Curated annotation (Swiss-Prot):
The keyword Zinc does not apply. Its main location: nucleus. SMART domains: BOP1NT, WD40. WD repeats lie at residues 430-469, 640-680, 682-720, 724-766, 777-808. This is Ribosome biogenesis protein BOP1 homolog.
Length: 808
């Protein structure tokens, strides 16, 4: 017999007639009546319920896709009930309410299978749902299996053109049908709703009504025979119970309350249960104690000796005595010849005192060890050894092993912090001496350099072309472009003067005219300026002749300090001098004469104010001079200032002035005219100063190779102190656009320029991030560094006159 899914069923004994009537038989393929009955059933399966055959039940609305689901069988059951309503009403009441008859003539067929019918039906099996009558021996179990591949997965043949082999070893070829053919076949076939696919034989089989009834009963745990009574053999109890004659009934019986546990007992039991659970939980938490086997005690075991705490600690924490070093070649009885002392060495050893001798013997050579005499200092050496052990305490120190890499902070990879200058792109040649200063124009198109060969050179950044050269007549200390884009000013510090140049090629004509009007003296006509300049009679472009006159007058005034009429001369701070005709042709507009050599100066961000430093001025308050160019005003803000100044800077956003001295940085409020804060610069003498464009942080370089990062919101002491150079830090600078390029660079006398990534966060909970990213190397000491205003380019100058541009 074949299962509904097409798999061969195991062999079993011949069933009884009643059971055989309910076995699925749609798979049987026999000759004669079987073929004709199946053909006739298939031809009329699609007919309606108006004119059904007497021995055939027509099922509609059942699909093959739902043959394996409970929902499909429930739907099939409903269809069968609907089809049997009319016939059930016409019956004469033979069916009881307890009988399970799902379609017409089922009871009649089952009776025929059980032998209840007429004489003609004896000895024959009637299959439900058909009119086919077969012999009892004709069963699906006797039908041979065509495919003899055995009990193996049929998926093994899914890629083959056959499904197995028959009994003669011939291939059983697959019936190739496309999806369209299967769809049309399922549409045209009236038995498609009860047709299943036999994968073993690659054919379709139609389920009969009996097969469907059998599946329906098995799914609901019912017997296959609807007439089977499972309680037919149960014997009824014939004993009659008389409650009046029962012994418990006579006395009323025990009370039900006697069988209910007492409430007090329940509480006691619950308490005992809780105690047991608690002990069990504690037992699980306690570590399991390993049962130690009994061992023989050691007779001389010191661990079981009773002693006080101090003795116990000293005994078990004793430190072994240091061992004597093994004898060396010097103490050998046959040392190499170079170890044997000469006569002069023997005499020198004899002249030394005993306490001054390193060794109490001199090396000697013996032919054999038995020839070595007794060592006379044995007792002294042993005694000295005992003194060392007794009077020199031994201490045990725990050695702290720390990985040096773990002490370093976790910093991002420098490759992730690009762009930053890392390759040499331009050389600006022509300098014959030390270049002490470089400056880039506000638009980033021109580069100005100040050299000790008395020349100021202006180069075009992109091409390296020399645009203009100015002869100052003296070594140039510093050059700087005005940071304001509305003014085209190049300021130069030359010994005792500040020279203001208007490079006409660097800006538009309107900007140049506005700059010249800005620098001219207010209230003076052009003729008055010519007369004032003719009085000076200066022909050189430098400031030596102009400033020397002021210097001589100042020194003469200080020599006659007793004269009251020299007070006004001593109080003179600086003097504005208009340029001569020759100087104006060269681009020089005005010069400012100082009393001492100008070391450094800086512009305000708006370009109107300027501060100059003259640290060698013998008048202390004149070491720091502030100038207002538009009104030609000169004033010294620090009247009682005695420290030596090194650098100065204006705050980029607020009226705050930073002044660096030898050991500190002072922060002044220019509006309140008072000292706001003082930052202690630990280390050597400060050399340079740079302010962050945001104004809350600044850098200080000193002579001890340190670069200190100060955070004004953090403390008066350095937030970070970096020693990356091996020489004096001569220059440092922040990038003007730190929002786009958070970079700063330091240059030192060791010939190196270190580029750092310095990110300042707006969140006060985050500290500034400082990461070294690149080292740019030169052959000679670096004196100046300057950033491009819009790009991550760095310009440097060295002692040998090399000016370079490093690009990203």
């Amino acid at each position: 017999m074949t299962s509904p899914k097409g798999k061969p069923s195991p062999k079993r004994s011949a069933p009884a007639p009643a059971t055989a009537a309910l076995t699925p038989c749609a798979e049987e393929r026999t000759e004669g009546a079987t073929s004709s009955a199946s053909a006739s059933a298939s031809s009329h399966i699609s007919s309606s319920f108006d004119s059904p055959r007497d021995d055939t039940v027509v099922l509609t609305g059942y699909t093959a896709e739902s043959e394996h689901s409970a929902h499909g069988y429930e739907r099939l059951h409903d269809i069968i009930l609907q089809g049997s309503d009319t016939d059930a009403d016409s019956e004469d009441g033979r069916a009881n309410e307890d009988d399970v008859i799902l379609f017409p003539h089922a009871e009649e067929l089952s009776n025929a299978a059980a032998g209840v019918g007429g004489d003609d039906d004896n000895g024959r099996v009637v299959r439900l749902g058909t009119t086919q009558h077969l012999d009892e021996s004709d069963s699906s179990e006797d039908e041979p299996t065509l495919n003899r591949v055995g009990d193996i997965p049929l998926e093994w043949y899914k890629d083959e053109d056959h499904i197995g082999y028959d009994i003669e070893g011939k291939k059983l070829m697959k019936k190739e049908r496309s999806a369209l053919e299967r769809l049309l076949e399922a549409t045209d076939d009236p038995n498609a709703m009860r047709t299943i696919y036999d994968a073993l034989h690659d054919e379709k089989k139609t389920l009969s009504n009996a097969d469907l009834q059998l599946i329906f009963n098995l799914q609901r745990n019912r017997t296959t025979n609807p007439n089977y009574d499972m309680y037919s053999e149960v014997q009824e109890d014939t004993v009659v119970f008389d409650p009046l004659n029962h012994p418990l009934a006579r006395s009323g019986g025990p009370s039900k309350k006697a069988f209910v546990p007492a409430l007090h007992d329940m509480k006691v039991i619950a308490k005992m249960v809780r105690r047991l659970r608690k002990e069990e939980a504690e037992r699980r938490l306690r570590p399991a104690k390993e049962e130690k086997e009994e061992e023989d005690q050691l007779l001389w075991d010191d661990s079981h000796v009773e002693m006080d705490t101090h003795t116990h600690f000293k005994y078990f924490n004793r430190i072994p005595k240091p061992k004597l070093p093994p004898p060396g070649t010097f103490e050998s009885y046959r040392p190499p010849p170079e170890y044997l002392p000469s006569e002069r060495a023997k005499q020198r050893q004899a002249r030394l005192r005993t306490i001054d001798r390193k060794e109490h013997f001199l090396p000697q050579s013996f032919d054999a060890l038995r020839h070595v005499p007794f060592y006379h200092h044995t007792i002294q050496d042993r005694y000295q050894r005992c003194l060392d052990l007794a009077f020199f305490p031994r201490a045990q120190r725990t050695r702290l092993v720390v990985d040096p890499d773990k002490l370093l902070p976790e910093l991002p990879d420098p490759k992730d912090l690009r762009p930053y200058p890392e390759k040499l792109s331009f050389h600006y040649k022509g300098h014959t001496a030390t270049v002490r200063s470089v400056s880039v124009s506000p638009n980033g198109q021109y580069l100005a350099t100040g050299c000790d060969d008395h020349l100021v050179r202006v180069f075009e950044v992109q091409t390296g072309r020399l645009m203009k050269r100015y002869d100052m007549g003296a070594p140039v200390q510093q050059v700087e472009f005005c940071p304001s884009t509305s003014l085209n000013i190049l300021a130069v510090a030359v010994e005792y003067s500040l020279v203001f140049i208007v490079p006409t090629f660097a800006a538009h004509t309107l900007v140049n005219d506005h700059t010249i009007r800005f620098l001219r003296a207010p209230g003076l006509s052009a003729g008055q300026r010519e007369a004032a300049h003719a009085l000076g009679a200066v022909d050189t472009l430098g400031g030596r002749a102009v400033t020397q006159t002021a210097l001589d007058a100042d020194e003469t005034a200080h020599e006659a300090t007793a004269d009251l009429h020299d007070i006004e001369e001593r109080e003179k701070r600086a003097e504005f001098v208009d340029a001569s005709a020759k100087e104006r042709n060269a681009g020089i507009v005005v010069k400012i004469a100082m009393h001492a050599k100008v070391k450094k100066f800086c512009f305000h961000i708006k370009g109107d104010y300027l501060c100059a430093l003259c640290p060698k001025d013998h008048v202390k308050y004149r070491q720091t001079i502030m100038l207002q160019l538009s009104k030609r005003k000169v004033f010294c803000p620090f009247r009682k200032f005695s420290e030596v100044v090194t650098d100065c800077r204006f705050h980029p956003r607020e009226p705050i002035f930073f002044l660096a001295t030898t050991n500190s940085v002072r922060c002044y409020n220019l509006m309140a005219h008072r000292l706001q804060r003082r930052f202690k610069a630990s280390g050597g003498v400060t050399t340079c100063l740079s302010i962050h464009p945001e104004g809350d942080n600044f850098l200080v370089g000193d002579t001890t190779s340190h670069t200190s990062w100060f955070d004004m919101d953090f403390s008066d002491k350095p937030y970070k102190r970096m020693r990356s150079h091996k020489g004096v830090v001569n220059a440092l600078a922040f990038h003007p656009k730190t929002n786009a390029y958070p970079l700063f660079a330091t240059g030192a006398s060791d010939g190196q320029v270190h580029v750092f990534h310095g990110m300042v966060y707006d969140d006060y909970n985050k500290n500034a991030l400082v990461v070294p990213v690149k080292i740019l190397k030169h052959q000679r000491p670096v004196y100046a560094v300057a950033w491009h205003p819009t790009l991550a380019w760095l310009f440097t100058s060295t002692e040998d006159g090399v000016v370079t541009a490093w690009t990203e």
